[in-house]
Curated annotation (Swiss-Prot):
Keyword Transport: yes
Purpose of the protein: Rubredoxin is a small nonheme, iron protein lacking acid-labile sulfide. Its single Fe, chelated to 4 Cys, functions as an electron acceptor and may also stabilize the conformation of the molecule. Electron acceptor for cytoplasmic lactate dehydrogenase.
Organism: Desulfovibrio desulfuricans (strain ATCC 27774 / DSM 6949 / MB)
Stated name of the protein: Rubredoxin-1
Protein family per UniProt: Belongs to the rubredoxin family.
Domain of life: Bacteria
Single GO MF annotation: electron transfer activity
Length: 45
């Protein structure tokens, strides 16, 4: 599955570490657990 990286702090969202939930299926109000920015601040890894 595709990983995504926060453009602000570099946090990497890896679906394998989150019950195999793809990034695009996360809730719209999901935010970076490190710096708190929204999903639109992430890019494919």
């Amino acid at each position: 599955m595709q990983k995504y990286v926060c453009n602000v702090c570099g946090y990497e969202y890896d679906p394998a570490e989150h019950d195999n939930v793809p990034f695009d299926q996360l809730p719209d109000d999901w935010c970076c657990p490190v710096c708190g920015v929204s999903k639109d601040q992430f890019s494919p890894a």
